[in-house]
């Protein structure tokens, strides 16, 4: 994972296979910080700062299912891939950091799950 990146196993252990529960807390904290700073600079985005991480229903159930169903992680990544396909259709240009992050293998992608970090 490289020096300076603190890797922890999430408190909620029902995350499927061996590597699925590994969360890069440093990456998620940087993303959260950048999102908060952007929203603070752009007043039109203030309502989004107060939105919950989980939309009612779908995300919660998919993350809960990761530990119970055999192909749940594969389906979750397929859903993420379809949602990311918008970047290709809209011809977004990614910076090197975003490209590096997207090249992380699927099993090591961070998963936001309910519960506290340890």
Swiss-Prot record:
Origin superkingdom: Eukaryota
InterPro entries, A to Z: Egg_lysin_sf
Protein name, entry field: Vitelline coat lysin
Organism per entry: Tegula pfeifferi (Pfeiffer's top shell)
């Amino acid at each position: 994972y490289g020096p300076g990146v603190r890797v922890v196993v999430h408190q909620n252990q029902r995350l499927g296979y061996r590597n699925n529960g590994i969360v890069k807390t440093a990456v998620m904290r940087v993303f959260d910080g950048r999102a908060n700073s952007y929203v603070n600079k752009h007043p039109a985005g203030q309502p989004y700062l107060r939105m919950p991480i989980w939309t009612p229903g779908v995300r919660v159930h998919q993350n809960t299912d990761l530990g119970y169903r055999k192909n749940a992680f594969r389906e979750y990544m397929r859903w993420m891939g379809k949602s990311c396909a918008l970047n290709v259709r809209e011809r977004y240009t990614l910076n090197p950091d975003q490209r590096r992050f997207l090249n992380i293998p699927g099993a090591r992608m961070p998963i936001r799950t309910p519960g506290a970090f340890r």
